[in-house]
Structures are given as C-alpha cells and as structure tokens.
Amino acid sequence: LECHNQQSSQPPTTKTCPGETNCYKKRWRDHRGSITERGCGCPSVKKGIEINCCTTDKCNN
C-alpha cells in the first residue's frame, strides 16, 4: 500500500507501507490553526481529533 505522508499543506509525498491495509488522514486545531497529518495505518485518536482511514493507494491526500 502507498500512503501520503506530508504534513498539512506541504507538497504531496508518499511512502510505501509494507503489510499495511490502511492509510489515514488526521485533522485537529491548535494555536497555529488547522493541522493535518497523514500516514500508514489507522491509529486510534483522542476526542476532538478527526480521522479518516481508507484502503487504496494514495487515498489519504
């Protein structure tokens, strides 16, 4: 599986995730504004963090 791994509005980058079946995109707000984190897997998140998990190559941009 290939997942995007750039932060927030950085130019898109991807990484290969051997053995993974999910990519994720996580969003939250802090004093700097809205933060977006992308990567492999489907981590559990704390309340107040929005997460989208998906199962196809580069689906988490």
Curated annotation (Swiss-Prot):
Query: SUPFAM superfamilies from the entry?
Result: Snake toxin-like
Q: Which InterPro entries match?
A: Snake_3FTx, Snake_toxin-like_sf, Snake_toxin_con_site, Toxin_cobra-type
Q: Which cysteines are joined by disulfide bonds?
A: C3-C23, C17-C40, C42-C53, C54-C59
How is expression of this protein distributed across tissues?
Expressed by the venom gland.
* Keywords on record: Acetylcholine receptor inhibiting toxin, Disulfide bond, Ion channel impairing toxin, Neurotoxin, Postsynaptic neurotoxin, Secreted, Toxin
- Record has Cell membrane as a keyword: no
Which cellular components does GO assign to this protein?
extracellular region
Q: What does this protein do?
A: Binds to muscle nicotinic acetylcholine receptor (nAChR) and inhibit acetylcholine from binding to the receptor, thereby impairing neuromuscular transmission. Produces peripheral paralysis by blocking neuromuscular transmission at the postsynaptic site. Binds to the muscular nicotinic acetylcholine receptor.
Family, as annotated: Belongs to the three-finger toxin family. Short-chain subfamily. Type I alpha-neurotoxin sub-subfamily.
Q: What is this protein called?
A: Short neurotoxin 1
